[in-house]
């Protein structure tokens, strides 16, 4: 494998690692968003339950305080993950550009090498054709003379 091929392989590996990191961040953010939705639903459910009993009415304010604190922490975590996700997306874009740069260089190198070999082959065939033509002329002149 050429040096450019190795660079493509290494940078592709790095790109895949960055994509996996990004996917992990996106999954975690989605989980936190689902947790937030679940918390909101639980809050509504507890609010409905609290109106039906005295014990619920007494315990509900403590539950609300804890739920609001949890919601605040979830929102902060989601915001931080959104920032980290955007940074990871930028890293993936940059890594992708690197891979494309090295793939293009590798492809150009391979094309130039194929062209060089094709030119060498054409020259060899031209030389062979010229030699055969000269031999044919010599044999014709010997047979005529």
Go through each PLM region and give its residues.
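Charge-rich amphipathic alpha-helical interaction elements
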Residues: 1-145
């Amino acid at each position: 494998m050429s040096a450019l091929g190795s660079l493509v392989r290494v940078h592709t590996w790095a790109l895949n690692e960055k994509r996996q990191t990004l996917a992990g961040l996106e999954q975690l953010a989605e989980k936190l968003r689902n947790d937030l939705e679940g918390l909101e639903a639980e809050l509504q459910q507890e609010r409905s339950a609290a109106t039906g009993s005295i014990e619920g009415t007494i315990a509900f304010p403590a539950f609300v305080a804890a739920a609001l604190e949890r919601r605040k922490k979830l929102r902060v975590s989601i915001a931080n993950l959104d920032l980290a996700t955007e940074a990871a997306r930028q890293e993936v874009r940059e890594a992708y550009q690197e891979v494309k740069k090295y793939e293009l260089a590798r492809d150009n190198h391979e094309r130039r090498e194929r062209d060089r070999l094709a030119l060498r082959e054409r020259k060899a065939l031209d030389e062979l054709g010229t030699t055969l033509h000269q031999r044919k002329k010599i044999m014709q002149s010997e047979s005529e003379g």
